[in-house]
């Protein structure tokens, strides 16, 4: 397992998708984690485990995103729309799981297995979006075929 050397925030940490993010962090990275769990004011103070560490949930509305390098957003389009630009303006790269930014031309739509190499070209904090789950699964399956035959359209 790799050590996690990034400061990370999980927005929507108390929800189902937020918990999956935490599980992935726990299962794929060892050692101490500089992790900030963010949710609504009503969840503030709640303790959540990730690996052998306990983390206190913080109020998203007052969080200083300059404290983290990457924020995973999984709290819905409205929350992403309000807080993702704020995070970027404070120097944090956002990986957004909502539909909010999927159709924005200047925001990359990334599936790591398909076009993750695009991330190597990014130097400044930005918002990164991902497609919905069925699109992602389809494109992961089509990628090896595209590499051989250059698929230009899927109907």
Question: Locations of the language-model features?
Answer:
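N-terminal Rossmann-like NAD(P) cofactor-binding subdomain of oxidoreductases
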Residues: 1-155
């Amino acid at each position: 397992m790799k050590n996690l050397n990034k400061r990370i925030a999980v927005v929507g940490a108390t929800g189902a998708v937020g918990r999956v993010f935490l599980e992935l962090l726990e299962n794929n990275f060892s050692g101490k984690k500089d992790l900030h769990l963010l949710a609504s004011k009503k969840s503030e103070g709640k303790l959540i485990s990730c690996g052998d560490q306990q983390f206190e949930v913080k109020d998203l509305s007052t969080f200083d995103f300059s404290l983290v390098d990457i924020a995973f957003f999984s709290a819905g389009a409205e929350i992403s729309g309000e807080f993702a630009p704020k995070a970027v303006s404070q120097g944090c790269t956002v990986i957004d799981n909502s539909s909010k930014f999927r159709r924005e031309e200047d925001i990359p739509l990334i599936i790591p297995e398909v076009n993750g190499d695009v991330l190597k070209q990014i130097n400044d904090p930005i918002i990164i979006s991902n497609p919905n789950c069925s699109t992602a699964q389809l494109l992961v399956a089509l990628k090896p075929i595209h590499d051989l035959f250059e698929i230009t359209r899927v109907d």
